[in-house]
């Protein structure tokens, strides 16, 4: 079985993430969306909330599983009997950082490969950071995220007022 791990913070999951997951689900037998705890990033949503949102968004894809993790990605990949990490590249600026991560993961787990996909053109400018900023200021994010995520963002920011 050909299993790929797609890691990220997914705070929140965007239509760009969903596009990559949909494409990966057609390429690989199994896709594991690995939601990172990322406490240093001070996420808006808890790990449990992010895992739940991702699960709801990827429900249409039967070969996609969603798991939270807080250990090294290289270890998580091996624990899930995978040897491929999928990453999205939106712009050249993403490449340098992703290249460093790929090199480090290769050092930590020599049998693990990193595979990069570029997003669809109409999704290339979307980032979770921008989505959070727009939502925090009361902007409409429905074009960029699943309706479930849009509602969760509205609720989250309503609680903070």
Curated annotation (Swiss-Prot):
Main location class: cytoplasm
Biological process per Gene Ontology, one example term: coenzyme A biosynthetic process
CC terms in the record's Gene Ontology section: cytoplasm
Residue numbers binding substrate: 9, 41, 73, 87
Enzyme category, top tier: transferase
InterPro entries: Cyt_trans-like, PPAT, Rossmann-like_a/b/a_fold
Pathway: Cofactor biosynthesis; coenzyme A biosynthesis; CoA from (R)-pantothenate: step 4/5
Record site feature (Transition state stabilizer), residues: 17
Enzyme Commission designation: 2.7.7.3
UniProt keyword list: ATP-binding, Coenzyme A biosynthesis, Cytoplasm, Magnesium, Nucleotide-binding, Nucleotidyltransferase, Transferase
Compartments, record wording: Cytoplasm
Domain of life: Bacteria
Names of the cofactor(s): Mg(2+)
Positions with a binding annotation for ATP: 9-10, 17, 88-90, 98, 123-129
Catalytic activity, reaction form: (R)-4'-phosphopantetheine + ATP + H(+) = 3'-dephospho-CoA + diphosphate
UniProt record similarity statement: Belongs to the bacterial CoaD family.
Function, as annotated: Reversibly transfers an adenylyl group from ATP to 4'-phosphopantetheine, yielding dephospho-CoA (dPCoA) and pyrophosphate.
Assembly: Homohexamer.
Protein name per Swiss-Prot or TrEMBL: Phosphopantetheine adenylyltransferase
Annotated source species: Hahella chejuensis (strain KCTC 2396)
